[in-house]
Amino acid sequence: MKTNELRNLTTAEIEQKTKSLKEELFNLRFQLATGQLDNPTRIREVRKNIARAKTVLRERELGINNG
C-alpha cells in the first residue's frame, strides 16, 4: 500500500488497517516458523506497510501535512 493511499483514508480506517496488517504479520511469522511460508519477502512488505501507516498517524498527531 502506498503512502498516498493511506493519507486518503480516515484515522479510524488507518488504525483498522494497521491492526489487520499486524495480524497478517503474526500469521506470516507463524508460517515461517513452521516452514509453510511460500513468499518470505511478504513479511518485509507487511512490516513496511505497518510503518507507513504508523507514520501517517503520527504526522496527523503532529499536524504535519506531507503529500
From Swiss-Prot:
The keyword Ribonucleoprotein applies. One of its GO terms (molecular function) is structural constituent of ribosome. InterPro entries: Ribosomal_protein_uL29 (IPR050063), Ribosomal_uL29 (IPR001854), Ribosomal_uL29_CS (IPR018254), Ribosomal_uL29_sf (IPR036049). Belongs to the universal ribosomal protein uL29 family. Keywords: Ribonucleoprotein, Ribosomal protein. SUPFAM superfamilies: Ribosomal protein L29 (L29p) (SSF46561). Transmembrane segments: none annotated. It comes from the Bacteria. Coiled coil: none annotated. It comes from Halalkalibacterium halodurans (strain ATCC BAA-125 / DSM 18197 / FERM 7344 / JCM 9153 / C-125) (Bacillus halodurans). The lineage of its organism: Bacteria, Bacillati, Bacillota, Bacilli, Bacillales. One of its GO terms (biological process) is translation. One of its GO terms (cellular component) is cytosolic large ribosomal subunit. PANTHER family: 60S RIBOSOMAL PROTEIN L35/50S RIBOSOMAL PROTEIN L29, LARGE RIBOSOMAL SUBUNIT PROTEIN UL29C. It holds the Pfam family Ribosomal_L29. PROSITE patterns: RIBOSOMAL_L29. This is Large ribosomal subunit protein uL29.
